[in-house]
A protein has these predicted regions:
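Phosphate-end processing signature that detects enzymes handling 5′-triphosphorylated RNA
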Residues: 1-177
Length: 177
């Protein structure tokens, strides 16, 4: 079964030696800050002509954390609409029919296939309010790319601040400073 949600996040490209500042000032009164690390693998899909990339759409199959599954992200003003399906949808890593149907217009009938695999070492800091609701997740990612065919792609580091159900635009502004 698919789920659809709106995703609101800000991303920051940072240098390899960047030191994430303390996040204690972002924790609401009575809230908590919990940190963990994980390794992610995300296989990205597109057409031979990169139709999704040209439209700002991403399609991936992710493993390695609680966000496992198929994710199609479609741009919208200040946010993205994210369509999620479980890993079981899509035999042998093939794009699930449900996502092929949703993206058919964007790819104009072209075949979707794997184009790259991103490996991410993620340190995630979850900020919760006094009731335990997630305000935001701050992810510090070290990313490397392998293109289909085995060529090594770029490596980079980025910090992502994604609002949770209890988050607000003011949190993003404060976190971005």
């Amino acid at each position: 079964m698919e789920s659809i949600q709106t995703e609101r996040e800000d991303k920051f490209d940072v240098d390899a030696d960047f030191q994430l500042p303390t996040l204690a000032s972002l924790v609401p009164t009575g809230g908590a800050l919990v940190s963990s690390e994980t390794d992610l693998s995300s296989e990205y899909f597109d057409t031979a002509g990169h139709d999704l990339l040209r439209r700002g759409i991403t399609l991936r199959r992710r493993t390695g954390d609680s966000d496992n599954g198929w994710h199609a992200k479609v741009p919208a003003e200040k946010a993205r609409t994210e369509i999620r399906l479980p890993l079981g949808n899509g035999a042998n890593n093939a794009v699930p029919d449900e996502l092929n149907d949703v993206l058919r217009g964007a790819v104009m009938g072209a075949e979707l296939s794997a184009v790259a695999t991103l490996t991410t070492r993620r340190t995630i800091h979850t900020v919760s309010d006094a009731d335990g609701a997630v305000v935001a997740e701050v992810a510090d990612d070290e990313v490397s790319v392998v293109l289909i065919g085995g060529a090594t792609g770029p490596q980079w580091r980025e910090v992502e601040v994604e609002l949770g159900p209890a988050g607000s635009e003011s949190f993003l502004k404060k976190a971005g400073k």
